[in-house]
Structures are given as structure tokens and as C-alpha cells.
Amino acid sequence: MEHQSDRIRDRAVPFAALVGGNIALALGPWLVRLSDSGPVSAGFWRIALAMPLLVLFARMSGEKLGHMSRATLLAVLGGGLLFGLDVASWHLGIGDTRLANAVLFGNSGSIILMVWSFVVLRRLPMGREWPAIMAALAGSAILLGRSLEISHANLVGDLFCLLAGLLYAGYLLILQDARKALGSWSLLALAGLASAPVLLGLALALGEPVWPTDWTPLLVLAFSSQIVGQGLLVYALRHFPPLVIGIGLLTQPAVGALVGWLVFDEVLLPLDMVGVVLVASALVLARVVTPRVRS
């Protein structure tokens, strides 16, 4: 009986980490809207405020921050640049579109990586890859069309979030080999070190207010997104296959839609729900069928 209890606990803890990590990340757009700095400035503080803890966790885990090859260093710098642009684009989109759309399109990197794999491997989609692509295209068309019906600003917000998904896919591809040489916390810390100046420079160029009057949303954003969300998912990824990770990802649009409805009166009509389900299904399928590719 005790052995069975231990086995249930061994499964429950990683599952709780998977769900908790996705919920923490899904609350990010809400906190960006609550911030009284600019959206790109909020991205800078999200990275900068989390840096000390990321470095501390890397050292506590025995990871070495300063020992890497030139190729790894260049990959980290390039990845950090793309990550900074990803955060900036996503945060700009969050302010204009609905939270459910922002979360879905912001996570579109999985689908983009799947399509990129076809280009690299020089082959057409097969099997379950076709339904993933068709669902992504159909769902995106529905959501983009609905945003255009609401306002042009909503459509622009969607496009910024889609651009963020594209940039995040590039970030993952560039850091593909660096992940072997660096631990998870070290990679997050070094990528953050490279992306923070990018975000600060963009915020200043856009004329955004950088210094907030209320630090609470930014402190919670940095802790929930960079520490709790990323940390829990790093832990959970070791315990589940891609299908379960993909299904866990569906927590994010559900939380985004709920917060959008309760806090910002964002109502999803039945057609919106069809679009959300199609894109969410595509995200799950993309995580299952995407082969590992080398850039």
C-alpha cells in the first residue's frame, strides 16, 4: 500500500508542476496589462528582475556559467537577441488583442518548428502532420478574421503575437546545441543577459516609460514567468512524453480566456471557440510529430 502511495505521489508531483508551470506562464499577459510601464519595458523588467535568482539557481545546481566554447557563446548571444525580440513583440501584441489569442499565437512556435522541419528535411508532411497544419491554418484564419471584425488594432495585436511565436522558434533552433553544453538555469540566465539590453533599447526607442510607479505587477511577472513557470516546466519536461506536454499546454489558452472574460470582459463567441480548439489541437499535434532537426 505504501509502495502504491509513493508511485501515485511520484506521478502527481510532476503533473502538478506541468499544470502549475503553464498556469504561471498564462498569467503573464494579465500582469503585462497591469504594469504601468510600457509593454516592452515590462519585458525588460521581467528579465532583469529574475536574473539574480536565475544565476543563484544555476550555481546551486552546479552549472558553470562562464565556461563555454566560442560557438556556444555566439549561439547564446544570438538566441538572447531573438528572445528579446520575441518578448517585445509578444508584449506589444498583448495590449491590443484578446488574452486567449495572445496566449495561443504566442505559443505558435511549436507549429512553426514543425513546418521548419519539413524545409530542412526536404519532404512533405505525412500522417498526423497534415491535420496539424490544416487545423493551425483554419483556426488562425478564424481568429484573425474575428479580430479584424472587432478592430484593426486587434488584428495587429494578433500579428505581433504570431511574430513572437516565429521569433521564439528561431530562439529554440539557435540554442539547440547550446542546450547540451549548458544547464537549464544557466541557459535561461545567459539568454536573459543577452536579451535584457535589447528590450531596454527597444523600450527607449519607442519612447515608453521604463521606470514604473507600481512594482508589484512586474515583480510578480518576473517571478511567475521566468522562475516559477519556466522552472516548473523544466522539471516536468523530464517526466512526460511530448503528447502529455502538448496537452498540458492547453491550460494556457484556457486560463487566458478565463482571465480575459473575468477581468477584461473579453467574450469568446462559438466561432472564436472553434478557432481556439483548432489552433490548440494543432499545438498538441505539433509537439507530438515534430522531428528533431538541425539548423
Predicted segments, located by residue:
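C-terminal-most transmembrane helix of multi-pass membrane proteins
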Residues: 2, 47, 146, 214, ...
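Hydrophobic/aromatic residues within transmembrane alpha-helices
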Residues: 35, 42, 46, 77, ...
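Helix-helix packing/entry segments at the starts of transmembrane helices
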Residues: 102-108, 174-196, 226-262
